[in-house]
Amino acid sequence: MPRDRSRSPRASKNPTATFDTTKGKFEAEIFLDRVPITASSFIDLCKSGFYEGLHFHRVIPGFMNQFGCPHSKNPKSDRAGTGGPPDGTFKNLKTGGTEKRSNGGNIKDENISRDPNAPGTLSMANTGRPNTGGSQFFVNVANNDFLNWFSPGASKHPVFGKITSGMDVAVAISKVRTRDDNPIEPIKMKSITISGI
């Protein structure tokens, strides 16, 4: 008789995020099992509505699409790319403990999972210094292994999710016309919906 592995302690069902943009929808698995602080912070921001109405502020063809700065609510703001979430606390959805955002909404780096910055992955943006990730992240549309936290070099960007459907939408966003990497035609995030948690 086959075993029901869904009840096994090894079985892991991560939450899904559905991104509804003005260019279409895509879905991603969020790696709560692997990077619980990063994933829990992202989910908390999604559920609070933090990301709604923000625009992709940095798009580079063959590289990535960056998103999540509160200043990008105005797609023409010259401050887009410089902001983050407010300081505060959020629940670690894996452990049940309390985590915090501090020093400008930053969270602790989670350099534990060796998921590479491969096409379709969601990865934390930062200032280039440790523990400076907040709300900004990017969608890789190419193999950007030089950004892996475990690769040599200064750039360290932990992956916290991967697109499971709608990769064509992410690629289409990466190909829009830009000026100084900012899309000429603004691309807005209408909503991010979390399911499975």
Which positions does each model-derived feature cover?
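Cyclophilin-like peptidyl-prolyl cis-trans isomerases
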Residues: 1-197
